[in-house]
Amino acid sequence: IFSKTKSFDPYLERSETLWLLHWMLASDPMLTTWYYIFNYHPSIIINKEKLTNELVSIGKFSKWKGMSANTIKRDVDCFARTYTFSNKKGEFTEDSIECPLAELGLISTTYTKGEYEIQKGPKLTLSDKIFEYALNDYWSKQTNQIITFEKLMYDYGSPGKVFQLDEKSMEQYLEKLEMDSKNFVFSKGAGGLRQITKVKEISENQLLKNCYKKVA
């Protein structure tokens, strides 16, 4: 994406790149704060102080090396700055590079200081090609050729969790994917069973190129 010789988006100007960065951050269990918030956090309301305490408790239980309350607090602060605009009006400014993923609309501020809200539902700038890339990446960690709709929606590290989609939005992405791509089949069976079948292997590099087809 940022290669000096052939770059799709060297100056971080395209929403595709922002969504890819979000996917890489929030689908990686090693990046605990990001992964926990988008996959495990029990509420759409995030309180920074409570979140810090939750992560400290998890760290103590899991015996994280080099963990301290201060390092986790800084991590939570970094997360908040990444996803929310620094100005009170929530507008994009020249200083918005400090909050590169704010324009994705995944996290919003509330009227309570230190509180944020996860925005679940349709994501207007999340393209079909980015969704397909994320789906394929998620699938690479699975062992089955068929995945249920529910697993794709609610499994930890899944596109449904990481992108905070609702079921209607997920269905729309899958239906569009089946129409435009020969790689996946979305089916609805008896009793309302919905599942996705991967019909062939796909090159990750090709999927990445597809995301930037207009400028590649």
Question: What residues fall within each predicted segment?
Answer:
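Donor-sugar nucleotide-binding helix/loop cap in glycosyltransferases
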Residues: 1-216
